[in-house]
Amino acid sequence: MAGVAQRGIHPYVGTTATGQLTGDPAQGGANLAEETVYGTPLGDVTKQERWKHEEHPLDGWDRMLTHAEAGKLPDEENTFRFRNFGMFHVSPAQNSFMLRCRIPAGELTAAQMRGLADIAEDYGNGKSAVTTRSNLQIREIGPANLVNVLTRLQALGLTAKGSGVDNIRNVTASPTAGFDPRELLDTRPFAHALHHYILNHREFYNLPRKFNVAFEGGGAVDTVADTNDIGFMAVKIPAAAKGDSLKDAAPIALPPGVYFRVELCGITGHKQLAKDGGILVKPTEALAVCAAMIRVFLENGDRTDRKKARLKYLVDKWGVEKFLAETQKKLAFPFVKFPLEQCIKRPAAVKHGHVGVYRQAQHGKNYIGVVVPVGILSTRQMRRVADLAANYGSGALRLTPWQNLLIPDVPDAFVETVKRQLVRIGLHHEATNILGGLVACTGSGGCKWAATETKGQAVTLGAHLNKKLQLDHPINIHLTGCPNSCAQHYVGDIGLQGVKVGQASSEGYHVVFGGGTGADAAIGKQVFTGIPFSDLPTLLERVLKTYQAKRQTGETFAAFTRRHEVKQLQEMFSE
């Protein structure tokens, strides 16, 4: 002790890098305890995780103000940061920004649609694009208008916060929720509640990777919930039953009624649809279950490899049982295990139920599904559609995951008027129109990953097929520009993945047949490889005519292709 006192210091106690206590100053010190991101050493995480650790994703507003004031385009780090606010610098495809909104359940008012048209006209390229998450995007926004766009959007009662990078994306619900005669449950309140929960919890803006959630209420139009990380699927129990508590296997009484099944880990770019998790959830508990599952992913997802950071990889590593057990620890009520077979599932969705005129649950009212070719709307069309909704409906609009929109609440007396007006502005409403089944990602015109110009080629392809044949069974054709599958090509009747082909690197597609969602869920199988786009319209014309000639009575295209092997299809369609 004399030696310590003579040196003029206090007796030392510190912590080593491994968390142990030490009396040796050389081994300890606050700066030696390694920083971590949810348990992963900071030295092991990706650069994106380091950026988020240095500054919270929602603390970048001043950066955007600075860039907007200077009219400056962002570097790599700020490109990443600005996406947290819904502004995407899409270089090199376009040296400008794309706005991606958040429109929970795809619900818009006529006034909001007009306001979005104003934003597209004043700051963008005069167009908007309906996305596969029932959302809207506006492109070709200059850097000087970064903040102008977002403040105008907020003035409309909308936001873009968290619509990109490592966040929970736009929350989808059944497109016909609230007016569908077949639905088991109106899912809009769940989508809106989760939307606001996300907006008010900062920790949810620091996920390991993007996250998709959908609520399927059992209506006529498929929500494509099985392509989401979490899909809540409405089911019905016809009579009193008993489930088992996940906590202790104790029996739990279940009164008859509507519940949610929870499906997990849909990620179509990896050829995986969401699978039933074996549990039954009361609607009143759905939001808590969703929040708990997201928190488990937040705390345990991989932050060292962005290619393996989605929920699928955590569940692959742990197994479903452990994932549910970890989620259970965060809940004040027990998970209920219940066999899927004892639930009454919804009937199959109406193929192309998002296109055409359909009766609503409300007497004398109809919804009109509008064909929006590859999701592109001009500002004139946006305003006219808003006018139609306001003048002949209730002023409400719905966007769907099929890249189109619905005008609900149209009285019987005005249906023909609305149909005529749609044709006058270059839009359609016929369920037999092949353009109604086209889905296309942004493509090389606005995305650096895309190998092909998907949207323009989709329109060319649709026009050719419309001219050459008449469909009597609706068919979906999905075009995606790269393996990320933003257009979900593996679940289309016909799926097309863009590739470069030949020595000249011309644009072409791998061709997939037999995909589906919902009650008809399946991952399609690749039949043709690297078909130049110049040959594709003729090939698909031959494919569809062969199907029509050789199918069984009432057989869908998906069923026809599924009952044949790849080699058989290649031979049949090459004749």
Task: Please report, for each region that a protein language model flagged, where it lies by residue.
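Peripheral terminal and linker regions in Fe-S/redox and tRNA-modifying enzymes
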Residues: A2-E575
